[in-house]
């Protein structure tokens, strides 16, 4: 009925054994993900698919798992977060190559959570600078590194964040069930 399926390979699920090996924090562990993608190519009928998402929201996984520590593996280490983010870039690129070799017609990309990041004080130079850095790190750093290894970008938008310096200073309403400030106009 006009519905086109998208296969999402990785949506933050990390097996315990992979986590015990430090998951995506170790570059050598990317090989396990590559094997998973290759096995999936052989076991699924990917010839009938057109779209594959290799990674869902790598920025969200990295920040909540390795910066805020709110989600597994519940670490608070910016350096580890940077390694994880970099290794997810490598994992995507390698997966892209494996999938294209298996079926060159596939359209492959990531689902990116892109936030509307704004300065709380629009004319304050420090807030503007921080906002530009945050926007780049959250929205564009990953996508810029995979630009030659993607056929599309899945766009997920959930919130607007306002920054005063390095502190998030969002209005208190309206918020969703996760406590995220909602601003539908931010998608424009």
Question: Model features per residue range: what roles?
Answer:
Residues 1-188:
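Non-catalytic scaffold segments within catalytic domains of secreted glycoside hydrolases
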